[in-house]
Each structure stands twice: as C-alpha cells, then as structure tokens.
C-alpha cells in the first residue's frame, strides 16, 4: 500500500532544470511558463521560483493544482495521474517538499481509497483504507502496512478488532463471524495461536491454548491484504 512512486514525487530533478529556466527569467507575481519538454506552469512566482498558488501540467498528462513554496509542492494540493491512464488516480491533501505529508486522500485506479495520515510519501499513522471489493480497515499504519491497533471489516460480514503487525493479525484481538461465532485471544501472523476463547454460534465454548489454528467452520480469519 505504498503510494510514493518516482513520478509522484514530481521529480524536481526535472524541477531543478525547470527552476533554472524560470530563474533565468526572474519571474515575479502572476504568470505562466512553458518548458522545452512540453510542461507548463501557470500561477504565482516569487524571485524566479514557483511560489504560491499554481497549476503544473506534465507532458504525459499529469497535473498538480495547489500550493508551491520555493519551487516545490508545499501545503494543500491535488495531483492527478496522466490522461493516458485507463482510469485516473489522484491524491488530495497536504504536501511537504514534493511528498504526500500530513492529512490526505489517495484514490487508486481500481476504486480503492485511503484517507488519513501520510509521512514522507508513505501511509503512516492513523487512517481508513477501503478496498474496491468492499473490505475496510480503520486504524494504525506503519510504512504502508496495517500495524498497531485497528479494525478490519470484510465484505462478507466478518470482522476483527485488535492488534496488527506488518499487515497481518498479530497479538490480542477479537474475531466475529456473521453466524454468531467469536474468538477472543492471541494471533500470530494471521492465525489463532496462543491463549484464547472460542464460542460456537450455539453458545458452547473452548478456552485454552490454540496452536496455528486457521479458521473455524470453514471460515478463514486471515487478513489477505496488507
């Protein structure tokens, strides 16, 4: 679930070239600038740098609309992929030094979306991730993976609340099935492992030690997406 790709960074290696060209003109205030490779910027300048509100269009169709500071995307802004993409994906939110940083929303081409915290271009902190198939996770993330406390809801009605590590069920948690079954206990890498209690839908229960037990009554309680 990492979202920071090279092109998403608006590679102002390219921008370094762009900035040199702009600075030669020493543009100031509102204006526009066309680059030799077909890129185009329209907005505010300060001492020869993109600074303030502006719109930057790349030759491939990508577009950024928002705030700039000293030639870099900084503040609030929206970035969309190129027109050649089968479906558009975009990021809307806060930026720092050309990276997603702070609060934001990222929507993928397949309709999956994440809303929450970003850090230096990665999903990091707290947020909600919704998959295109209807699954949803709300909770803590680290380096783009489910990590910490969170809740995962499957489209089939199953749900888990508890601890995650490296994208999987790890630690103490509660898993519930639509049929009324429930497990409260320890998990290791997505499977029941350690001390716990399992209730059948008829109310009968088992308490004790579970050893690499995956699923109950044909159901799987493993998170398949990181």
List each language-model region with its residue ranges.
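Eukaryotic acidic, serine/proline-rich intrinsically disordered low-complexity regions
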Residues: 1-24
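Intrinsically disordered low-complexity regions specifically enriched for long asparagine
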Residues: 9, 32, 201, 211-214
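Acidic/polar residues in short coil/turn loops that connect beta-strands
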Residues: 13-15, 37, 60, 83, ...
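Conserved anchor residues at repeat-unit boundaries in beta-strand-based tandem repeats, strongest
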Residues: 16-28, 40-51, 63-74, 89-102, ...
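Alpha-helical segment of the N-proximal tetratricopeptide repeat
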Residues: 30-32, 36
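Terminal, low-structured helical/coil segments at or just beyond the last alpha-helical repeat
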Residues: 215-226
């Amino acid at each position: 679930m990492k979202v920071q790709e090279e092109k998403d960074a608006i590679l102002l290696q390219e921008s370094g070239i762009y900035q040199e060209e702009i600075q030669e003109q020493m543009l100031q205030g509102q204006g526009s600038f066309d680059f030799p490779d077909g890129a185009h910027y329209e907005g505010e300048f300060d001492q020869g740098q993109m600074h303030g509100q502006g719109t930057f269009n790349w030759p491939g169709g990508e577009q950024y609309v928002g705030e700039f500071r000293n030639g870099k995307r900084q503040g609030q802004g929206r970035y969309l992929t190129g027109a050649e993409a089968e479906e558009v994906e975009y990021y809307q939110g806060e930026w720092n030094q050309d990276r997603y940083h702070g609060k934001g929303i990222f929507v993928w081409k397949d309709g999956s979306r994440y809303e929450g915290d970003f850090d230096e271009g990665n999903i990091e902190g707290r947020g909600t991730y919704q998959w295109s198939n209807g699954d949803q996770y709300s909770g803590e993330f680290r380096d783009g993976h489910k990590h910490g406390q969170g809740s995962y809801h499957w489209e089939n009605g199953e749900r888990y609340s508890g601890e995650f590590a490296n994208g999987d069920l790890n630690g103490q948690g509660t898993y519930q099935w639509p049929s009324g079954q429930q497990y409260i206990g320890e998990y290791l890498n997505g499977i029941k492992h350690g001390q716990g209690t399992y209730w059948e839908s008829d109310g009968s229960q088992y308490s004790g030690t579970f050893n690499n037990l995956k699923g109950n009554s044909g159901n799987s309680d493993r998170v398949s997406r990181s």
